[in-house]
Amino acid sequence: MTDTFSFNVNSDDLQKRSDHIKMGIHQAPARSLLYATGQVSNPEDMKKPFIAICNSYVEIIPGHVHLRELADVAKQAIRDAGGIPFEFNTIGVDDGIAMGHLGMRYSLPSRELIADSAETVITAHWFDGVFFLPNCDKITPGMIMASLRCNVPSVFVSGGPMKAGLDPQGKATTLSSMFEAVGAFKSGLMTEEEFLEMEQNACPTCGSCAGMFTANSMNTLMEVMGIALPFNGTALAISDERRDLIRDGAKQLMRMVKENVKPRDLITKEALDDAMALDMAMGGSTNTVLHVLSIAHEAGIDYDQADINEIAKKVPYLSKIAPSSKWAMEDVHNAGGVPAIINELIRMGDVLHPDRMTVTGKTLRENVADHEIINDEIIRKFDVNPYSKQGGLSILYGNLAPKGSVIKAGGVDPSIKDFTGEAIVFNSEQEAVEAIDSGQIHAGHVLIIRYEGPKGGPGMPEMLGPTSAITGMGLGKEVALVTDGRFSGASRGISVGHVSPEAADDGPIALVENGDKITIDLVNRTMHLHVDDTELAERHEHLKPFVPKMRNGWMARYQALVTSANTGGVLKGADELFPS
């Protein structure tokens, strides 16, 4: 018999996972179907590794509209390296387009759908390796979660960031500039002509949005985690360098398949610590906290927000990127990129774990050894002039957030060390937006936007509209916003999100009333509601039970199963659903 007929799935010398679907006489029907795909031409092809390309090509997402072409580059590189590529696609949500309406409630939940769907295709077809091609917001963490569930040799190459746009004065812009322009236009600070010109030029190319928003935060973090190649987070989407990364990634994947290097070999507790250290150094999106916690959950790693706070205390803020400065991702790339930042952190001596292995087959230290800072205005040295001696994110605890909350400290004006204001309470984002638009918000207010958490929203929508409007109106240093929802990576200002427990879980944020005083202390990482425990207990007695908003569709199931932000907003697992 030929090798194809004599395959034994129980053999000790099993070499390829995909042999389960293509070898042995009983798999003849499967082989017929494989020939019908056109990807397999002859029995010799059946002996080659089967490689999945998990793409996320979606035409309504500018960060993904070019991924069909990049997948073709990856497929050819896999064939050249001796594999058989099979492309499949996942869904995707564009957070910028979905912002401020029902669509935003589907954004964070889409992460779970992406993880589930990728896990399904990869597991059902016994692929030998997976080339993940993500780019924006929830797609990247969803794919990482799937890779950990399947634990098959995997490499990640993102689609890359877009070029920065230009405003009417010729200054570089990103999507956050456009959101803030809405507030400026409404306040009479921008003419209609300027507004329309900016609208058409803020996002000039395909790629993820040009600042250090969620997409680029996650794509840079993958570099230091060791699951993506150097410069994955900064090489432009439209560049030849991006295509070279695709080709190199395919070659590395084929090596990893041969050596059986798997995601759980690379994504360790130390890798997650290093991811958050880089996030602190670059002032990344607050959403990275949610996603790193969810990645830890899938990897079976005990990880807590308190761990993140400890990292924040010792890692300096080295590269301030839009929306916190004028610099875009292409500027960071030209200044030395993420490898230069990693190298600077390694130079500190006790911040990273540089001897971990990565997808290159080399250690993190070896990957970045030759990469120095080229422009020390964009990437600063830790011992010369860091933006701050502590990282760009902070976890705040207190009686308003017993299980924690998150603020992008690097997006707050450096002159602000603490803020005390008077609560003005809204039970939805829409109510808050209407109040802002009608001029009800003034200096000294702390906007409370609640019942917008993972369960309450449902879906934990981003509050980019309210934060951008506040900034655009010139109140970014005089008004704070506190929510059990979350923020876009494009948000800045005194914006505290992820308040846990959320209002829908009877968290203290549900007890806040108009006029209550609230103090946000960035130095001591606390947030305090100035109401005594007796009064809070009395308010709790009169608190009305939360009524779920969704009664049909998959979001109703999501609302029933989702956990709190302090655990990453993942869905309840078997241990919680079926306790022993």
From Swiss-Prot:
GO terms for cellular component: cytosol. The keyword Metal-binding applies. Mg(2+) binds at residues 95, 137-138, 462. Binds 1 [2Fe-2S] cluster per subunit. This cluster acts as a Lewis acid cofactor. One of its GO terms (molecular function) is 2 iron, 2 sulfur cluster binding. [2Fe-2S] cluster binds at residues 136, 209. This is Dihydroxy-acid dehydratase. It catalyses: (2R)-2,3-dihydroxy-3-methylbutanoate = 3-methyl-2-oxobutanoate + H2O; (2R,3R)-2,3-dihydroxy-3-methylpentanoate = (S)-3-methyl-2-oxopentanoate + H2O. InterPro entries: Dihydro-acid_dehy_C (IPR042096), DihydroxyA_deHydtase (IPR004404), DiOHA_6PGluconate_deHydtase_CS (IPR020558), ILV_EDD_C (IPR056740), ILV_EDD_N (IPR000581), IlvD/EDD_N (IPR037237). GO terms for biological process: isoleucine biosynthetic process; L-valine biosynthetic process. Functions in the biosynthesis of branched-chain amino acids. Catalyzes the dehydration of (2R,3R)-2,3-dihydroxy-3-methylpentanoate (2,3-dihydroxy-3-methylvalerate) into 2-oxo-3-methylpentanoate (2-oxo-3-methylvalerate) and of (2R)-2,3-dihydroxy-3-methylbutanoate (2,3-dihydroxyisovalerate) into 2-oxo-3-methylbutanoate (2-oxoisovalerate), the penultimate precursor to L-isoleucine and L-valine, respectively. The active site is at 488 (proton acceptor). It comes from the Bacteria. It comes from Leuconostoc mesenteroides subsp. mesenteroides (strain ATCC 8293 / DSM 20343 / BCRC 11652 / CCM 1803 / JCM 6124 / NCDO 523 / NBRC 100496 / NCIMB 8023 / NCTC 12954 / NRRL B-1118 / 37Y).
